[in-house]
From Swiss-Prot:
SMART domains: Ribosomal_L2 (SM01383), Ribosomal_L2_C (SM01382). HAMAP family: Ribosomal_uL2_B (MF_01320_B). Keywords: Ribonucleoprotein, Ribosomal protein, RNA-binding, rRNA-binding. Residues 263-274 have a biased composition (Basic and acidic residues). One of its GO terms (biological process) is cytoplasmic translation. PANTHER family: LARGE RIBOSOMAL SUBUNIT PROTEIN UL2M (PTHR13691:SF5), RIBOSOMAL PROTEIN L2 (PTHR13691). Gene3D superfamilies: 2.30.30.30, Nucleic acid-binding proteins, Ribosomal protein L2, domain 3. The keyword Ribosomal protein applies. One of its GO terms (molecular function) is structural constituent of ribosome. It comes from the Bacteria. The lineage of its organism: Bacteria, Pseudomonadati, Pseudomonadota, Gammaproteobacteria, Pseudomonadales. Part of the 50S ribosomal subunit. Forms a bridge to the 30S subunit in the 70S ribosome. One of its GO terms (cellular component) is large ribosomal subunit. This is Large ribosomal subunit protein uL2. It comes from Pseudomonas fluorescens (strain ATCC BAA-477 / NRRL B-23932 / Pf-5).
Length: 274
């Protein structure tokens, strides 16, 4: 994987930094694992904007990724290829199981075409294998972690993400997340060893607004540039600072205000994130 800084042959190329991976598959994705992905433009069934800054972008297909890996225990799989996925920052790996079935998984770092992976209690401790947390040694790095047994991976799924298993006590294990949070998870839950691929994703620079539009992201207008009818920060004679602590268009505090409201799982958090 290489970091390529483009030559400033035009204003749009001047700040472009690309992450080039020669191992990525250059052909079409595996068609049986594709699904139609329709665009909403951020609108709901009434045609009203419910998510701002969404719209346009290149047409995409959704790749069906196996986040559970719980119904192929003990069946060896060969990594056929590593692919780009427009729906996520991580790369995906196409597995060919010994029973002939193919599935996509989130590609772990260091896994390449031809490698053998397996899931289940007897799986060896190596990157890409999926086991229950009770069978993973303390100190191991994991990703794709379940919060409920059988529900599928929910934590550490994006590019370069991982967590460290720091303790095991009774029916729970304790994980240290990248945010600094220490959290208890049921030892029955599954996780994949290693960290997620494409950790260089954060080093890239799109270089121009148009590259963001290709990805379906529309511009963000500052509140102080709006009229009072549109935003609490709007209006005023000349340029203003908004005149109050930063709020959303609906008046809720933003820029650092705590938004976590799930008290039900507070007991699982040993230490809050930094």
């Amino acid at each position: 994987m290489a970091i390529v800084k483009c030559k400033p042959t035009s204003p749009g190329r001047r700040f472009v930094v690309k992450v080039v991976n020669q191992e990525l598959h250059k052909g079409a994705p595996h068609a049986p694992l594709l699904e139609k992905k329709s665009k909403s433009g951020g609108r709901n069934n009434n045609g009203r904007i419910t998510t701002r800054h969404v719209g346009g972008g290149h047409k995409q297909h959704y790749r069906l990724v196996d986040f559970r890996r719980n119904d192929k225990d003990g069946i060896a799989a060969t990594v056929e290829r590593i692919e780009y996925d427009p729906n996520r920052t991580a790369h995906i790996a196409l597995l060919l199981y010994a029973d002939g079935e193919r599935r996509y998984i989130i590609a772990p770092k260091g896994v390449s075409a031809g490698d053998q992976l397996i899931a289940g209690a007897l799986a060896p401790i190596k990157p890409g294998n999926a086991l229950q947390l009770r069978n993973i040694p303390v100190g191991s790095t994991v990703h794709g972690i379940e919060l409920k047994p059988g529900k599928g991976a929910q934590i550490a799924r994006s590019a370069g993400a991982s967590a460290q298993l720091v303790a095991r006590e009774g029916v729970y294990v304790t994980l240290r997340l990248r945010s600094g949070e220490m959290r208890k998870v049921l030892a029955e839950c599954r996780a994949t060893l290693g960290e997620v691929s494409n950790s260089e994703h954060s080093l890239r620079s799109l270089g121009k607004a148009g590259a963001k539009r290709w990805r379906g992201v529309r511009p963000t207008v500052r509140g102080v540039a709006m009229n009072p009818v549109d935003h609490p920060h709007g209006g005023g004679e000349g340029r203003t600072s908004g005149g109050r602590h930063p709020v959303s268009p609906w008046g809720f505090p933003t820029k650092g205000a705590k938004t976590r409201g799930n008290k039900r799982t507070d007991k699982m958090i040993v230490r809050r994130r930094k």
